[in-house]
Amino acid sequence: MENEEKREYLAKSRSNSRNFLNDSIESKNIFGVDKKSEPNLKQSIDGGLNFSTTSSYNPSNLPRTSVFVSARNLSSTVGHGKNEKKILTDLNFFLKPGSMVLLLGSPGCGKTSLMNTLALLTSNEKITGNLLFNGKTGDPNTHHRHVSYVVQDDFHMAPLTVRDTFKFSADCQSGDKSEKERIEIVDNVLDFLDLKHVQNTVVGDEFLRGISGGQKKRVTIGVELVKESNLLLMDEPTNGLDSSISLEMLTKIKNKVQQEKMSCLISLLQPGLEITKLFDYLMIMNQGQMSYFGPMNQAIGYFEGLGFKFPKHHNPAEFFQEIVDEPELYCGIDDGSSDGGSGDSGSSSGGSNYNYNFKNKASSTMMMMNNNNKIIPPLKGSDEFAMAYRKSIIYKHILEYIDSHIPDEEERSKFIDYSTTLKPYSTGFGRQLSLNVKRGFKLFLGNKASIRLRLLKNVIIGFILGTLYWKLDTTQADGSNRSGLLFFSLLTFVFGGFGSISVFFDQRQVFYSERAWKYYNTITYFLSMIVTDLPMSIVEVLIFSNFVYWMTGLNKTWDRFIYFFLTCLVCDVMSLSIIRSVCSFTKTKYAASAISPAVVSPFILMCGYMKHSNEIPGWWIWLYWISPIHYGFEGLLLNEHSGLDYHCSPDELMPPSFLPTFNTSYPVGFEGNQVCPITKGEQILDSIGFHTEFYYRWVDLAIISAFTLLFWLITLVCMKFLVFRVYRKDPVGIKKSKPNKTTTLIKMNRNSTDSTTTNNSMNYFNNKHNKKQNDDSDSGEEMESVDVDVKSSGKANLRKDIPIGCYMQWKDLVYEVDVKKDGKNQRLRLLNGINGYVKPGMLVALMGPSGAGKSTLLDVLANRKTGGHTKGQILINGQERTKYFTRTSAYVEQMDILTPVSTVREVILFSAKNRLPNSVPIQEKEEFVDNILETLNLLKIQHSLIGDVESGLSLSQRKRVNMGIELASDPQLLFLDEPTSGLDSSAALKVMNLIKKIASSGRSVICTIHQPSTTIFKKFDHLLLLKRGGETVYFGPTGTNSKIVLNYFAERGLICDPFKNPADFILDVTEDIIEIIQPPQTLPTSTSNENNNNNNNNNNNNNNNNNNNNNNNNNNNNGNTSDTLNNNNKKNLESSLSSSSISFDPVESFKESKENQKLLSIVENSIMPVGTPVAVYHGKYSSTIKTQFIELLKRSWKGGIRRVDTIRTRVGRSFVLGLVIGTLFLRLDKEQNDVFNRISFLFFSLMFGGMAGLSIIPTVSTERGVFYREQASGMYRVWIYYLTFVLSDLPFVIITSYAYVIPVYFLTGLSLSNHGWDFFYHSFISVMLYLNFGLTSIAFATSLPVEEMAFLLNGVLLSVTSLFAGFMIPPPSMPAAWKWAFYLDFISYPLKAFLITEFKDMEFVCTDNKGAIPIPIPSQNTTKFFCPITHGTQVLDRIDYKISFQYWDILIMASFTFALLVGGYLSLKFIRYQNK
């Protein structure tokens, strides 16, 4: 936003506020309605608030584009019979063009379900009642054309820029507009959302750096606004935005709604007063039922009519949300003006001040109390509120209004045509395909790291193959090598397909969203995937083919090269189609990564190389015919061997000359005669069982293409009809846990001085020793106003020898990052000369607009920055920060990264056991955790699994669990980053009550917060306010009811409106351009000073009974006083608003202020009083190695066994494949062909182990985020974490291995000599192999930034290790330059061990000359058959395997295991991709 636009906007906002305040003061009601006069309810319903464009709604007068929504008895259920569950129950409401409806309710109340119902995006729900749009039911095929639905989740294509994201949405949803109009729409939305300056920045994700979280939320809004639809639905659109940006954005939306006559429903979590005033109607939901729907200006009066009391100057949105959840809070409220506490209550016309006092039974007929002196509210529970609303006059008028405004047939024609004549898609098929292809190429080109890696992979593998099979000859050995080379070429592309798993799942949620809104037909998106993949596939195959084909000396004709290229290309595309088809019908990437190898493995096995077609049993021959790889392999062999003549080198002639009977006369010997077994390439094809007709290669290519089309079709069908998740779940019907006595007391008895001792669970955070905290003598009364409550409690602090809080100060703090500008490396300063401090008992708020550096400063103070350059001084208890800092502090991150397979209690207890000193008994640690659970209201869900964001705990619960994990360390210094982000006002207040209590217990607390309500802001006693650029606008105490901070700005001519949230006001001050108002130097407050108010309040507390007895008189007097004060406020405010304005620099003003001078004098010296005890640490970690090892092992093991689906998939996959292999090679005999069969299936077992190892990558990626957080907190040693993770997975590795080995070993009839020892030896080698492959996957997953790269490199490694294992090309045939690769290949050693065990004592025969080579005897005019292999040692000698190395192989494999362990540990310890 430019300077002039900002000035104009601020002026306009100030003018609106001025007009609104004048009206409000005159009527003595913040919503502009005089409570003393009964308004015309029908007129309020018809006109709404601030909807002055039409005095009454007349459908025939509205433009054609308007949509009037009406709902009558709208209900929604899921399930059937006993499992039926109500989602929405008998909702009656309307959405009127030109008006905005605010939807409030706690998480799980049904807000998202209602939004989905209005958008016609329900799937399994049964909808009853009437839902009409302009009097007609919505057509699911065309309804989306008129609806813009902003969902909670920010699903975007990370590599796309902001402009490209908006442009794609506009192109797909506004096809009826010209290109120029669409560009203009995108430009307008970019300006509308203030995203113009980042329009060419990628959206990004956790691994691709892009725009900020708040900007990403605005992008989510923008992709719907470019649609320019008639019905606007927004589900919590302000999450992650600060209050000033939220207000600015919603004000613009309000203007847009009024100007364009849109119908609008918006759900919000913590709306401030200014935001609430923008809405015309209010809808409150609770457990799927409607507690209120009606005009905003009637809501307070409605609830007061039910017996509740709205506190004076309280935020209405908080009142509306809390009253249905915790009605006890608003029963029997003394709306006087006494001040009962520091910041929680008090009286001042300049802020939203209120005071909870309990009246006795005689003083109010509205309040009832039970025998335990607990307040009984007039209404409680969703059923009672819904029933009361249905009996209200408002409900009656709402129904009348809905029924009277359903248009007749004539009027319906003037509205949007909802008939099926409207096309579902705004663009044609060709246009959709063009847009998707264009975006696909942008996405592809945006992932440069993947492009480089894929190209490099093909260069490296192509070079390896070219040099390994350099200039193949036409000898017998090279004939076999040609077949092995061609088989491996296919494997290279098959394994490369695994890299697409993560990409598919990364983009699937975006596709689901766009498919639901009919951006395009599914087939166009599907075709665009194929089209955008094809160029890269062509380049990859071209590079690979040129290296392999010409370097190895394959059949050197251009037509055969072209066929080789085409076959490899089609096989590459086909393998990708197989993997994508698996991904399309699996729910998670965990399942896809486990199932994909199981699908691909039989196709590899049945291709004809490992098991010749003429040897496949009849019950599996169908698998041979449906294996697409078989046709690719057959085509390549036809292309290579057809017409090729082979010869024998002297040592390849049969029988060999060293045979004892070689020169013996017939019939004993061969009389010196020899033959060359294979002289024509067709002989090789015939021996395998392949076609020998040269033309058939094109048939094979056509069949591969047909299989590719089949897998494409499977993928398309699944993508079109399957949906695993589109929107966040909204679990209505789950009863919300009732606030415990402690929490209720904290909220209700805010002015009680002994509330600390009332709360047993909170007391646990108080110090056992009744010490009074010392204040710094130089701080002065204004600079130090912390009231530390450290009363003794019945429960001792865990660390009796350690102070409960600590002293932290920072001076001239500067933080810079390296950036590149104009091709030069420069440093960008994010923090500039920040000063401040925190003491025990202080709760400091870090505030500022987006980009001010709040989180950056918190990360610097908490020592969480992993990059950049920090300057300045940070002292902890007067000393430089040491490596033991993590033992003193705790950091609650904004992102709730938690272990999904652990329970709530387990994660908190885990933190306590690892972060509390080992000297604390286990029983005390568990009691400590119990009290944390009680304090955080988590007892009812303590044994619930955390789960993921979609199916696990709610956002509020996850926030509290995250806090509990850090509180379990019993920290002296607590950092919190946006602890209320994403919470509704009730949940946010609960969290802040806890944080305030923690600070009051004597701890030092620093907290960033971006959108605090008035009530929440008053919880903070100190404020550090930053502006964009990381400069200080204010540091100091806030004062009672924010008096000190507001007076600071008032002295500079900046007056906070009496009804404005002080937090919003001070954020406005941080704008680059601000206007100040002169000459007022103080706030327009009560004529009596605050000390008198405090004294009066104390007297009121001391004489509570007298006050209660005279309550009615006091209320009357308070009403007169309120009128007088409001008149004074109005005069002062009008005088100030009419004054002149000048420019103001908040940073320079603070630098020159006395507050800054006092701050500098404090931070110049140590703020810690002399003689204060300081904890002394002797180690970085609180717990011992033994404790860490046991706790980590327990957690990892529980996490493993709770991933039931993963275990079933891993074990089931191995067992099923074991049965397939076992029955395919059933009861192997000792014939000549069984020699190769034994070798091939043993080699395949190794390959399968490598593919099975891929399934652990998603798990490692998920756990890596948790590890980063815990490691930064200093919970445990890295090597213990890594070792226990591996050990906990070892049993599953063993089970998985045995699930494959047992059926294979006994079904195939492998050796059982030495009393079965060979079986156990084989099993042990298999377990070691599976373990090594798993360790390799872990190393890749921890050392690479994204899963795609981990899958891709795993495929490369599997290809290379398979190549050098000794099966594709025997060691004697390897060039000398590549022999080292054979010895470094960890697959070669288990293959060697398998073969030595199997062949060392085995004899082979040629029954009925089967497999024997006929040797002509010319002298006798006959033929004698030669059996090539009669003993297994011949096989071992031919491949140069020594029997004596059988057990050395185990040691070598163990050394590989150790090396992989070390490599994984080093990557986990030193490589970080979540940099701050």
From Swiss-Prot:
A GO cellular component annotation here is: membrane
Record field: transmembrane: 455-475, 485-505, 523-543, 561-581, 590-610, 618-638, 698-718, 1211-1228, 1239-1259, 1290-1310, 1324-1344, 1349-1369, 1448-1468
The ABC transmembrane type-2 domain extends over 445-722, 1201-1471
Biased segments, Acidic residues type? 776-786
* Annotated keywords: ATP-binding, Endocytosis, Membrane, Nucleotide-binding, Repeat, Transmembrane, Transmembrane helix, Transport
Which residues lie within the region annotated Disordered?
743-786, 1081-1141
User: What compartments host this protein?
Assistant: Membrane
Phenotype reported upon loss of the gene? Cells that have a abcG2-abcG18 disruption have an endocytosis rate roughly 70% that of wild-type (or rtoA disrupted cells). Disruption on abcG2-abcG18-rtoA cells have an endocytosis rate roughly 20% that of wild-type. The exocytosis rates of abcG2-abcG18 and abcG2-abcG18-rtoA disrupted cells are roughly that of wild-type; abcG2-abcG18 endosomes have an unusually high pH, whereas abcG2-abcG18-rtoA endosomes have an almost normal pH.
The record gives the membrane topology as: Multi-pass membrane protein
Q: Which residues form the signal peptide?
A: none
Give the InterPro entries listed for this entry: AAA+_ATPase, ABC2_TM, ABC_transporter-like_ATP-bd, ABC_transporter-like_CS, ABCG_PDR_1, ABCG_PDR_2, P-loop_NTPase
Against Gene3D superfamilies, the record matches this protein to: P-loop containing nucleotide triphosphate hydrolases
Extent of Low complexity compositional bias = 749-761, 1086-1141
Major location category of this protein: membrane
> Which residues take part in binding ATP 1?
105-112
**What is one Gene Ontology biological process annotated in the Swiss-Prot or TrEMBL record?**
endosomal lumen acidification
Q: Name one Pfam family in it.
A: ABC_tran
ABC transporter domain location: 69-312, 814-1053
Task: Look up the domain of life of the source.
Answer: Eukaryota
One GO MF annotation is: ABC-type transporter activity
Where ATP 2 binds, per the record, is at 848-855
Family according to the record: Belongs to the ABC transporter superfamily. ABCG family. PDR (TC 3.A.1.205) subfamily.
What is this protein's function per UniProt? Required for endocytosis and endosomal pH regulation.
User: Can you name this protein?
Assistant: ABC transporter G family member 18
Organism encoding this protein:
Dictyostelium discoideum (Social amoeba)
The coding gene here is: abcG18
